[in-house]
UniProtKB/Swiss-Prot annotation:
Xref: Pfam families: tRNA-synt_2e (PF02091)
Biological process, per Gene Ontology: glycyl-tRNA aminoacylation
Organism from which the protein derives: Maricaulis maris (strain MCS10) (Caulobacter maris)
NCBIfam families recorded: glyQ (TIGR00388), PRK09348.1 (NF006827)
MF (Gene Ontology): ATP binding; glycine-tRNA ligase activity
Gene Ontology cellular-component annotations: cytosol
Name of the molecule in the record: Glycine--tRNA ligase alpha subunit
Reactions mediated catalytically: tRNA(Gly) + glycine + ATP = glycyl-tRNA(Gly) + AMP + diphosphate
Known EC number: 6.1.1.14
Subunit organization: Tetramer of two alpha and two beta subunits.
Length: 296
């Protein structure tokens, strides 16, 4: 870092939002359904499909119940934040745009070693994959960028460029701290731990010890049935159906965190969620094509 004071966690977010807004992105809000990664926000998963261009950026809280450590691990969380950017079609200067965002948050590339390490991305739960790279700053992974090839089992019509910033990890790097809970949250004396440590403790206890497995399994079946019902309408409703696909995915993650799914069963659960995602993607693409044709 330069001599300039490192940005707080919230200032880091504001700078990224301002930067990507200046590049023509719609700055969206977090999706209000639990997701395991920012990519699963419909502004990325669904909007990456179909023929219409799209440029958006947003913060997304992500929940991975099995990653909780009762607030005792300095860099592993069951609830954390990602900053997502989706550019469709992908611009030819995506890498330069990304490097410009590092400048915006105060990383002096003349003083730090920024490298792109090939690492293709795949999310089998939603039938998605793409060609990608991890971005490393001084040996620490801080971002991932991906050229989507397939989402929900559908080949993309326009290749999208997706950027994912791990906000906590990036902030730890920028601020030079070793423990996520020591992060300067707002530049006014509040730390990340002041905001989130108690939640990490309580949700870890819930995820591993108290989540009612039988109830969660019934909820999973209900979400699965509702998703399929919405997709089987004469005029399918892919957006609300996708909400229930996301709910099913999160419920699976909770049951998995409780240790209630065997290795053999796990593949079956993932396949069920993937089928929901594929159904949502198929219905979305059909609706997008119809809208594009109507606009011609």
């Amino acid at each position: 870092m330069t001599a300039e004071k490192a940005p707080s966690f919230q200032e880091l977010i504001l700078r990224l939002q301002s930067y990507w807004a200046s590049k023509g992105c719609a700055i969206l809000q977090p999706y209000d359904v639990e997701v395991g990664a920012g990519t699963l926000h419909p502004a990325t998963t669904l909007r990456s499909l179909g023929p219409r261009p799209w440029k958006a950026a947003y913060v997304q809280p992500s929940r991975r119940p099995g990653d909780g450590r009762y607030g005792e691990n300095p860099n592993r969380l069951q609830h954390y934040y990602q900053f997502q950017v989706l550019l469709k079609p992908c611009p030819t200067d995506l890498q330069d745009l990304y490097l410009g965002s590092l400048d915006a948050i105060g990383i002096d590339r003349d003083l730090h070693d920024v490298r792109f390490v090939e690492d293709d991305w795949e999310n089998p739960t939603v039938g998605a994959w793409g060609l990608g790279w991890e971005v490393w700053c001084d040996g620490m992974e801080v971002s991932q960028f991906t050229y989507f090839q397939q989402v929900g089992g559908q080949d993309v019509e326009l290749v999208s460029g997706e950027l994912t910033y791990g906000l906590e990890r990036l902030a730890m790097y920028v601020q030079g701290v070793e423990n996520v809970y020591d992060l300067d949250f707002n530049g006014a004396g509040m730390t990340y731990g002041d905001v989130f440590l108690e939640a990490e403790k309580q949700y870890s206890e819930f995820n591993f010890e108290h989540a009612d497995v039988d109830m969660l399994i019934e909820w999973f079946k209900g979400a699965e049935n509702q998703c399929m019902a919405l997709l089987n309408l004469d005029k399918p409703l892919p957006l609300p159906a996708y909400d229930f696909c996301l709910k099913a995915s999160h419920l699976f993650n909770l049951v998995d965190a409780r240790g209630a799914i065997s290795v053999a069963e796990r593949a079956s659960w993932i396949a069920r969620v993937r089928e929901l995602a594929k159904g949502c993607a198929d219905a979305w693409v059909k609706s997008e094509r119809a809208l594009a044709e109507a606009a011609e």
